[in-house]
Amino acid sequence: MKKVISRIFSLIILIGLITALAYIYNKYYFNDFIKANENKGETSYYRDSSQKYNGLKSYCIENKDYNDALFFKKISVKKDTPYRITCMVKTENVESDKPETSGACISIMGTADQTIPIQGTTDWQKVTLLVDSKEQDTLDISFRLGGYDGYSKGKAWFSDIHVEEGVKDETSDWNVVCFLIDNIDANVEGKQYTYSLTQEDKDLLKDNLKRFANTVESFSNNAMTVSYQTVEIKEPLTSLSYDQENYYYVAAKDVKPLIDDYVQKNEYDHIFIGIRMGDTLSSIPVNEWIGLGSMRYDSIGFSNIRMPNDLRNSTMYKYNIKNDTFPEEVFVHEFLHSLERNLTEKGYTFPALHDNEKFGYENQNKTGLKEWYRDYMRCNIDSNAGKTGLDQIVYKTKPIQLSDFKYAQEIKFENVPHNIIDIVSQIISNFKQVMSSNSNSEINETNYVTITTD
């Protein structure tokens, strides 16, 4: 009798243990993803059966306070190859200290490559990150509540994750657009600012975009060609972004609701935003900038072109044989910041765009830094080591586009275990990946102090 009771008791314990393990597995096991966050104790990770997409349990990140938290997986990739990462994202009460750079997003760890972050409370939406592997043979693909330069709190759910390999467009034909933001109607620091582009503003922006296209083709010795268009946006822009260096400006997230349909349809390689942020009576606070570059709209180069507050008394953007024969300089300068960033990310070493004085190039009255830009684009700057400047490969280093995935190949990414052997195998694999990640310099460049695995 005692043996029977003992066996029954043991069976009950075994069933309870299996039930507990099943609960823990179903709620907290993240397959073969690795979890990482900056501030331990402020983030919870779990599988949420109450929030499903396509019948699949979602992966939930909950930041109770501002944090940068994610789960990621390292995959092997081909060098200099396009990859498309997609997933469905849902958010609840997401707030960010830097909304332009942090929120719910897909990102590549160790880089600034990430999707435009999502804040607030939103229903399921498809998010896509197009990325160039450049010189890397591995990528750490992460799903994030936070960002490379900011922190977020709230909840984010991720589901239906896919990774595809494409075929790169290796032409040097660039498709450039300037969106003319006809109206700003934004509340800044409690004050409502309303400005509109004048017809003269629009004419100057259009003329300088045309001049820009001809100039960069010439400066590159026709190593690149440029097609271009201007698109007027009638709907008012109602939000602006801020940072301590530049004060207020137009970030990708601010303008995305107004231009994204055009961007997706036309596959631009660079985006200019033409805008007026002041007049002779008042101005939105800006820190003297007239152009801002080195930004991205997803993977596309993104620049601001601001019209002078007092255009009547300004020579800016106006061709004049006596005063200014290089009015397109701001367009050229901001575009070159994108090329500079692209080439730097490929691992090349060359002068910074603002290093002109170090190499003996001075700003000229009528032509600005025209000679510097020309020699910069032709890799014709004299240095102690010989000629330097932009390597010609930069003209074929264009943003990844959806058309690069016409013949996409799906990559096995989200490994769902089917039995206990698969589970144990994934746990061992996770442990090895954690040990490898801790010694990986790219990951160490991020500021994660906590890496955990189930």
PLM region descriptions:
Residues Y23-E170:
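Extracellular and organelle-lumenal recognition/adhesion modules and their flexible linkers in secreted
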Residues E329-T344:
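Active-site recognition of the HExxH zinc-binding catalytic motif
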Residues I15-Y25:
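Hydrophobic alpha-helical membrane-insertion segments, chiefly the h-region
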Residues M1-L14:
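N-terminal Sec-pathway targeting helices
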Residues G278-R306:
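Catalytic zinc-binding patch centered on the HExxH motif and its immediate surroundings
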Residues K168-D269, M277-W289, K318-K322:
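Propeptide-to-catalytic entry region of secreted or membrane-anchored zinc metalloproteases
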Residues R306-V332:
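Short pre-active-site segment immediately N-terminal to the catalytic Zn-binding motif
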